[in-house]
Regions:
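Beta-propeller blade termini and top-face loops
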Residues: 1-184
């Protein structure tokens, strides 16, 4: 859901003020705050909905357009968290980052993606079975372990990006993803 602004003379914000936004039921959203025409919203399996508010239309994009249904996480090209992080870069025009076990980068609204990091998780294969397993196997490929759960770009220093994984690692790059340092 989104709201453009508080409506003057309306007595406040009501349920009529809200409109649909991109992504699934719980997801990261990313957009350029100076031009919020496009909103990128995440969903499970690394799917991102790109919503164009001017055209009132959207499309789904993926770094690897593969259906991971029923696959073990260790066999997936990219392991995405249910709420995989997506951020807009304030330092690089038209650039968005998306976290799997790698940090992925797009400069064309998700048509193409480039890996800009090595695996930034512990990559423990014995913990990369069916999603949600062994106790609540959901077989959708959405509940994976060994994924990035947070990505943040420095608001003041170009080229500085931090990541956090669900298996406890924190990495930083200070040279625009050329090298990464484990600072856990």
């Amino acid at each position: 859901m989104r709201i453009a602004h508080r409506e003057l003379g309306s007595g406040g914000i009501s349920t009529n003020s809200w409109t649909y936004s991109a992504g699934g039921e719980s997801a990261f959203l990313a957009f350029n705050p100076d031009d919020p025409r496009y909103v990128l919203g995440g969903s499970y399996q690394g799917t991102i909905e790109v919503l164009d508010y001017k055209a009132s239309a959207g499309t789904n994009v993926m770094a690897a357009p593969i259906q991971y249904l029923g696959m073990d996480a260790k066999d997936m090209k990219y392991r995405f968290n249910w709420n995989a992080p997506i951020i807009w870069s304030k330092h690089e025009p038209n650039t968005y980052y998306h976290g799997s076990q790698h940090l992925l980068k797009t400069t064309d609204m998700g048509k193409t993606w480039k890996e800009v990091s090595p695996d930034l998780t512990r990559n423990e294969k014995e913990k990369q079975g069916k999603g949600g397993g062994p106790y609540t196997n959901e077989a959708v490929g959405a509940e994976n372990y060994g994924t990035l759960s947070y990505v943040i770009e420095s608001p003041s220093e170009k080229g500085v990006i931090w990541t956090g994984s669900d298996d406890g690692l924190v990495y930083v790059t200070r040279d625009n993803a050329t090298t990464w340092q484990n600072v856990t």
